[in-house]
């Protein structure tokens, strides 16, 4: 998944393309059905729903990549003992490459649900399969192979917007500058005034699409009606939500996960997390989230990402125990429990013209895409929490200088000691205590070209020619979708749980992570009083599953 360490394809080819022996294939056979394909027939096509995993029994299948501009690139030729799939086939997502029979081909087709069952039932074989599926996706991402083609100026805010969206969702893409490619230039001219075109693998051409429109074109989300009753709907796919999904699905509960943008939440944008248990050398937030995302799907959790939740109906919670979630497209999901894991977003400080420069020099995350923009430049970063510290250290490897602005006297009250030590030891990071961002300069069309910050004790102002400012300030809970459903929140909008939320329970107190509505739980940053750390969020996400079981058991016995 995204942000894994770079893959040397040749050195890891044996892991990416392992050859199954006769015993392996015999173990797989009970999960699939044999399929025959005549010469030159297509087994799967990029942009169309993938049928699952193929195991080649006889013949050879050519794997190629089509970029939507008429270019076809060979990737591999797979013969007997090879299996054809990447990680998207755990959920039957659209294929990223084409597969054609080079002569008569006999295969064993394992559909997505049976692929998940195989991985769990045959643990040692499943480990090899999952490793290969993940490595193949990462290799496609690193190569810029497959996926949509973004045609436009590489420094365009809209190009960067879609790059960030695709990267955060672990989806490969390729950017083409029309000034350097005749075919792209001709296509851009054909669409008149379009400043950005996206060519999807299925051939569809989108003009400066929204993230939702692009996701639908790529088949990242379905449009099916989900009439079944879920055991758990998880709203939010950050560390807390993904932990809930992994543990709930692994224990046999019917789980669906929703997020309006991508998996990983704020933590997914962290360049490196070094104090998470079990990773002594650290791990990027994207890699940690990506592994959890795959893990949840392995156990059968469904993912609807990106999908925006607009409201929740709790009117039946006390009677039938049924809750209803309404999505932005009008679809509804029914569930016996809901876990609110929608997190918090960074606050937008009251700085004049801030909105003019969002995506044009003002950033709320620091990924490799933004780091490239800062090469050998002076930048500003506002915030004193762990996310700010991780971003400062990461950006210092690219920028000439990183100015860290904090309102307080130091970082000690809000940042982990290991990050403070690292910042103090980094010569091109300068801490500005008692300081706040006060002004932004530039043209919205061309972007930010300078900023002003002020010492709030003395009123002294300083101008800096920073073209990029990173904001990691405060936290505003993502809870507007809860309006009107009876879930109690504190004065800042964070969800109350446990004893403070027990007013809605006439017969019993609310459980530790339960809200004021029976069967509605809250975990992670969105919960009032939670520890705003990745480890704490994951712990709450795991712990809530036991409370869900208790609630479902009680609902069953009283029905």
Predicted regions and their residues:
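Cytosolic regulatory regions built on CNB/CRP/Popeye-like sensor folds
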Residues: 1-152, 156-164
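A Rossmann-like FAD-binding core segment of flavoenzymes
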Residues: 289-335, 340-342, 396-507, 550-559
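Short, well-ordered coil/turn residues at beta-beta hairpins
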Residues: 201, 236, 335, 341-342, ...
